[in-house]
């Protein structure tokens, strides 16, 4: 049955590989179950209810990806989009979280229509192959940087970024942490990178997953030995699962279906809606391009078969997520970790979805996975994705420069969508001014996108 539905042999994989890949993807993105409630709670939303909404949105979205597209991609409420929701729309602009959820709901409906009418698919196919390869490389740098940041290996400083030290960490965050909380976690993360790297070199099956589990176990040993001292006030929690509150599922009642349609025709609402639309659209396209390129899923023309199903799953998940009570649900770049483990079909996504469903009942275990244990996985996956740099044509500067701009913009501006927009603008402008555009037959949609991106930078 699995073979028939997921076409395992056709995709050169097997059930064991797919399940392991699904577990790996879940382990690298399980942090969202802890981080999203924390961010959304800043708006006054019930954190327990947001945890339930987050797990359910991830479960529904990832399952839809498997059913609609048979791809190994996982979905969950997106980082960055949740921060925009909480700190810009609600706290910064003064709107209620119910109003912000309504904008997310409207975005989902619009995306469903765009997906059904092939607009999103057309945008995906309009991007030149060189830029698609650049997106993959840029995402590799981006998620490697996220991993280093999550592990506090790099911290803010006078040069914007610098190598970790306890003093530098304290100055950057305005806290008084010590070696026994932040310092030891950095050492554990570095050890995790080395351990995971060795497992990769030795070609150990499930190397990324094993890297996460070994690093977490080392942390628990350090906690028992007194080398790691939890401090909840500073964000350093016990590495042991907390079953003191049992295994009950937090109620959704405080946030379920709390949409507020009053004032949706205001200019502010349109601006908020457009921001959600823009970031989600190009983050999703960027993730699909990057991860698909790494998995060799793109056809000879650089197109992704069944992309309509993938985009529709993303759109429907966002709509359901808003009703459940969480910010935009989107395709996660951490899906690359499962792809790196050999995941090629929807069975990987089904496995990840099931684990998100189980997390509702086993939240203490999943919430205990620390960021320093998942950080090495992100760093190593970044290495995997960098390999696509060999597909970029560096002999043609009209191709190389836009690719370069796209690559460096993602980590430097901390945004996949900004990298894509700058890559598209530079590609169109350079090829148009140099006269290369005629020979390359650049898609008309690329010109439209470039103009829209320029207008965005001018007016938003």
Cite the ranges covered by each PLM segment:
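Alpha-helical membrane-protein architecture signal
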Residues: 12, 16, 191, 270-274, ...
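Hydrophobic/aromatic residues within the transmembrane alpha-helices of Major Facilitator Superfamily
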Residues: 23-30, 63, 67, 144, ...
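Helix-coil boundary and interhelical linker segments in multi-pass alpha-helical membrane proteins
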Residues: 38-49, 89-99, 266-270, 368-370, ...
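Juxtamembrane transmembrane-helix boundary signature
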Residues: 58-79, 110
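Membrane-embedded alpha-helical modules
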Residues: 93-214, 350-460
